[in-house]
């Protein structure tokens, strides 16, 4: 059982981030990779508390090829459809392979099918609906992707989470001014004004410190003194 600080969960999350690129790029044949994935899938099913569930977000990358990802999608989609039918009937239904399914569909290039499944979910949580936004962003429909998460995100989704996605999507297509003006402050809020200022200065080096400071002061009326302390 994890401590109240969440140290074990944080360490496991970090470990997943380190392991995924190693497995994804390992020069092995499809048969061996499938054995690896079978073992990982079994581990995810038995993961309680769910320390390694984050692996599901990377399932497409772990498959390494679109062909293997499609094989996994074929295995996971039927169960996912059944779960969504139950949810539409108002029943509680959960499948620990949902993120794996969506990640595999994305990697396999089966983007329309992914959107179709998401449309069947009456209350998709952030970890699921983000895949629909990724599909739209990958198609170059950045504004639509941002609108998608704004429309479908539930009340439990923090505004900071939405802002981080929107900022990142805009930055990836070079729309830096919009990313900064509309989402940067909310997306990069840290535990102190100084930390927030430093994070923004690092991410937006094109902004002179005085201009950045002026924007932050204007964005938070009534708190100029707190920002001046960062200068």
Model-derived segments and their meaning:
Residues 1-231:
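Eukaryote-biased, non-catalytic alpha-solenoid scaffold regions
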